[in-house]
């Protein structure tokens, strides 16, 4: 199952904090990949994603949760540094990165405020819930903006994305460390079902073979989880009695 072209990776949060972080990561990646707003389709994807990110950021104490996790990861690394044979220089480097990200995040303005106060995002956001509500006659300001020189548009977008850098950088190092905290291990499901103890984990990672065309339906929390494998073709697809897959409980 090591051939990545023949497998697919799924991730599932085991608590609300991780759910929020994965959503933020997804939205930040979408903003980065659609930063070249040279047509209406890319522009609407960018502004719709920015609107979604504003909503996610308003739902909780994002900065506080990230700062707590940055501190927790530093403490975990300190414990690793005391283990014989550990690459102390690597541990120290990671700890310094965590401290640096925490300092930048702590001193940053309110996260997402630049998006919320941006007039163009605000105007577009009001029309997103209306079917077809982003036509040029609905949003003449966007229509004019898209016809500005690309240098002006890029400057506008780069400024918005730069305001999100403290969030993006902190989130990236946190999720990287969590994902690397546990390797994928081979498992077997029986009759499409698998369950186990979560042991206080934050994240499940599953790698499945593409060939059976299956997807996981996961339920769980920090103490226990259950996985049911279902066929993509609900009418004609089948689930093997024994399915080999890889799992990490991070």
Curated annotation (Swiss-Prot):
Matches recorded under InterPro entries: ZapD, ZapD_C, ZapD_sf
Q: Which GO terms describe its cellular component?
A: cell division site; cytoplasm
Which keywords does this Swiss-Prot/TrEMBL entry list? Cell cycle, Cell division, Cytoplasm, Septation
What assembly does the database describe for this protein?
Interacts with FtsZ.
Query: Mind telling me which NCBIfam families this protein's record contains?
Result: PRK05287.1-1, PRK05287.1-3
Q: Name the protein family.
A: Belongs to the ZapD family.
Q: What is this protein called?
A: Cell division protein ZapD
The record lists the organism as Yersinia pestis
Give the organism's phylogenetic lineage.
Answer: Bacteria, Pseudomonadati, Pseudomonadota, Gammaproteobacteria, Enterobacterales
Encoding gene, per UniProt annotation: zapD
């Amino acid at each position: 199952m090591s051939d990545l072209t023949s497998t697919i990776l799924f991730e599932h949060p085991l608590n609300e904090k991780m759910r929020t972080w994965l959503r933020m990561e997804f939205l930040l990646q979408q903003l980065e990949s659609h930063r070249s707003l040279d047509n209406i389709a890319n522009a609407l994807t960018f502004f719709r994603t920015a609107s979604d990110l504003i909503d996610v950021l308003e739902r909780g104490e994002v900065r506080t949760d990230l700062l707590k996790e940055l501190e927790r990861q530093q403490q975990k690394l300190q414990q690793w540094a005391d283990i014989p044979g550990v690459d102390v220089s690597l541990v120290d480097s990671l700890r310094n990165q965590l401290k640096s990200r925490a300092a930048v995040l702590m001193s940053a303005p309110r996260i997402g405020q630049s998006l919320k106060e941006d007039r163009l995002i605000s105007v577009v956001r009001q029309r997103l819930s209306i079917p077809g509500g982003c036509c040029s006659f609905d949003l003449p300001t966007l229509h004019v903006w898209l016809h500005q020189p690309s240098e002006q548009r890029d400057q506008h977008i780069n400024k918005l994305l730069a305001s999100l850098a403290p969030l993006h950088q902190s989130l990236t190092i946190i999720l990287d460390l969590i994902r690397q905290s546990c390797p994928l291990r081979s498992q077997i499901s029986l009759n499409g079902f698998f369950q186990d103890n979560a042991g206080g984990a934050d994240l499940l990672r599953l790698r499945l073979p593409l060939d059976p065309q299956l997807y996981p339906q996961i339920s769980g929390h920090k103490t226990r989880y259950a996985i049911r494998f279902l066929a993509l073709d609900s009418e004609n697809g089948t689930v093997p009695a024994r399915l080999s897959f890889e799992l990490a409980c991070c």
